[in-house]
UniProtKB/Swiss-Prot annotation:
Reported function: Essential for the control of the cell cycle at the G2/M (mitosis) transition. Interacts with the CDC2 and CDK2 protein kinases to form MPF. G2/M cyclins accumulate steadily during G2 and are abruptly destroyed at mitosis.
Compositionally biased intervals (Polar residues): 83-93
Transmembrane feature ranges: none
Identification of the protein by name: G2/mitotic-specific cyclin-A
Cross-referenced Gene3D superfamilies: Cyclin-like
UniProt organism field: Hydra viridissima
Region (Disordered): 64-93
Keyword tags: Cell cycle, Cell division, Cyclin, Mitosis
InterPro entries cross-referenced by the UniProt entry: Cyclin, Cyclin-like_dom, Cyclin-like_sf, Cyclin_A/B-like, Cyclin_C-dom, Cyclin_N, Cyclins_cyclin-box
Length: 420
């Protein structure tokens, strides 16, 4: 018992000694912290006293005018309007402080402000910077009234129409269409197929696109893939339908939200080919095209040119131009010989001639980049194609545009084209 009591007593003494040591250490740290804090406060106080006499308070820094000419002040002097269209009040208003309260502008003041803005833009004519036509409403009006050309991009209000970039996108597509054009004489090098077989294939694809309610761009891409593939590969007539089915499968995967499955393409070929054959042909097509699937088609240009022609969303002009452009898909000579943008422009020109008095306007010429002389050859061929549409053996497009859904435009009687 004696040793046990002694053990517990020693243990308690040791714990008390440890606690006293920790308390002393804490007090020392607190003293060091207080001393450092006092030194920081003293340093900050001294700094504020010295800075008081060396810098201007932020509240009044805008009122201090040094000897150096400020950039903003120099710019205002440069943009000062001529004396014959301004007065002293206009100059004083431009130099007022931002902190002052400005009165509401009267009609006279607004007129002077517009004159000032126009003169300011005139001073930058010699500047290397290029002003965008989308800067202001006044500049848009000046831009659209140039030579009777309408500013169609200022009418675009949808989120994805991008009026600031619409013309740049169009210019890029026109440059790209030359890169992805099929060879103009590829059908002459095919030993087992000809243009008539190609026309039958495209006519069948039109029926397939209507059966599965595919968007028009899918059909145009399918034809583009077929022509580009046949430009590099020689195909037997027994495999031509397989090429068409595989090309439409690729185009549907690229454009559609819910594309038809492989089994459906096997079904529409009446089980002529197996699913494995369709997939193998799809692989060969992608390899031959080097996976360049996003290519310009006639449909890309047609939508913009229709907008430039003031065509309403469900107008006969729109449906007739679409009908004529689809007719060119069947004709190998036209679809391969001419660029998609030229076919789109010529289709609108022929449709305008049938429905309106003016076939080609300055606005269409400005936004398409084609004048009427550039389109002469393509216009004549599309017109002849339109005249022979009713007697053509391939009637899928003719029947498609006979429906009221498309304004029955294929029933319209073609007119004689004037000599341009």
């Amino acid at each position: 018992l004696f040793f046990q009591k002694k053990y517990f007593l020693d243990k308690q003494l040791n714990q008390n000694a440890i606690q006293i040591y920790q308390d002393n250490l804490t007090n020392q740290n607190n003293n060091i912290g207080k001393k450092a804090k006092l030194e920081d406060e003293k340093h900050a106080h001294n700094k504020s006293i010295t800075s008081k006499y060396k810098r201007v308070p932020l509240a009044s820094i805008s009122n201090v005018q040094g000897s150096r000419i400020q950039p903003t002040r120099a710019a205002k002097e440069k943009l000062k309007p001529p004396q014959n269209i301004s007065d002293s009040q206009l100059v004083n208003d431009s130099l007022k402080s931002s902190n002052s309260i400005q009165a509401h502008n009267t009609k006279n003041d607004l007129h002077k402000e517009n004159l000032y803005n126009e003169s300011a833009l005139d001073t930058f004519k010699e500047s290397p910077m290029v002003f965008s036509p989308f800067l202001s409403d006044s500049s848009c009006k000046k831009y659209s009234s140039l030579n009777g050309i309408q500013d169609i991009d200022s009418k675009l209000h949808e989120v994805f129409e991008l009026p600031e970039y619409a013309q740049d996108i169009h210019n890029y597509l026109k440059k790209s269409e030359a890169k992805y054009r099929p060879k103009s004489n590829y059908m002459r090098k095919q030993t087992d197929i000809n243009s008539s077989m190609r026309a039958i294939l495209i006519d069948w694809l039109v029926e397939v696109s209507e059966e599965y309610k595919l968007i028009p761009q899918t059909l145009y891409l399918s034809v583009s893939y077929i022509d580009r593939f046949l430009s590099h590969m020689s195909v037997l007539r027994g495999k031509l339908q397989l090429v068409g089915a595989a090309c439409m499968l690729v185009a549907a995967k690229f454009e559609e939200i819910y594309p038809p499955e492989v089994a459906e393409f096997v079904y529409i070929t009446d089980d002529t080919y197996t699913a494995k054959q369709v997939l193998r042909m799809e692989h060969l097509i992608l390899k031959t095209l080097a996976f360049d699937l996003s290519v310009p088609t006639c449909r890309d240009f047609l939508s913009r040119y229709l907008f430039a022609a003031n065509a309403k969303p469900e107008s006969q002009l729109k449906y007739l131009a679409e009908y004529l452009s689809e007719l060119t898909l069947i004709n190998c000579d036209i679809s391969v010989k001419y660029a998609p943008s030229m076919i789109a422009a010529s289709s609108i020109c022929v449709a305008n001639h049938m429905l309106n008095s003016i076939p080609w306007t300055p606005t269409l010429e400005f936004y398409s980049g084609y004048n009427i002389q550039d389109l002469r050859s393509c216009l004549n061929e599309i017109h002849l194609l339109h005249l022979a549409a009713s007697t053509n053996p391939q009637q899928a497009i003719q029947q498609k545009y006979k429906s009221p859904k498309f304004g029955c435009v294929s029933s319209l009687v073609p007119l004689e084209m004037p000599c341009f």
